[in-house]
C-alpha cells in the first residue's frame, strides 16, 4: 500500500495511486517515487483529482526508499508544489535523485545525504496542466551519466536539457535536438502524443 508507505494512511487525502517511475537500486535499497492515481476530467483532459466531500487534496508524490533486507520503506520527501512524480532517476555515484512532476513538468534534484530538494521550476511551459499554447506533454524519462553526474531530459518542442552536477544548474544542449524528420511532425501544444520527447 503506497499510501501507507508514505505515512498517509487514514488521513483522508487523495491516495498515492501508483508508481510511474523506474526503480533504481543502490546500496541495498530501491529508490522510486509515487504518483497520483485519481483524476478528474476537466475540459476533456485528465487533471489532478478533485477530492470527494470529506477528503483533502493530493499531498504530492513522495520519494521513497525500500530496504531490500528489512522490507521497510523510508519516506525521503515530497515533490514540489504537491504534484505527482511522473519520472525519476538516480545518480548512484553522487546520491542524487532527479525527477519531473505531473502535471506541470517541474524538474527537481534531491540529495539523499542531506535531503535537500532543489526545484528548477517548470521546464515544459505549463506542462499537461496548460491549455492551448501553454500545453506541453511532460517527458517520461531522465537519463543519467554516472561518470559526470549529468542528467538529461527533453521537451515536447524537441529541446534537450542537461542538468550539470558541477554547476547545479540546468541548461539546453546547444546544436542538437530531438526534432528529427524520422520522428514525424508534431504540434507540441496538442495532447494525445509525446511530441518530440524521447
Model-derived segments and their meaning:
Residues 25-27, 91-94, 144-148:
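Residue-level detector of Asp-centered blade-edge/turn motifs that repeat once per structural unit
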Residues 33-58:
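Short, conserved, GDST-rich strand-edge loop motifs in beta-rich repeat architectures
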Residues 30-32, 96-99, 150-153:
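Conserved beta-propeller blade signature
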Residues 67-71, 111-115, 164-168:
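Short loop/turn segments that connect beta-strands within beta-propeller blades
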Residues 36-38, 103, 157:
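Residue-level signature of beta-propeller blades and closely related beta-rich strand-turn architectures
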Residues 61-64, 106-108, 159-161:
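A short loop-to-beta-strand structural motif that recurs across blades of beta-propeller domains
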Residues 14-22, 83-89, 129-143, 182-188, ...:
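Repeated scaffold domains used in trafficking and secretory/extracellular systems
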Residues 1-6, 74-78, 118-125, 171-185:
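Beta-propeller fold detector
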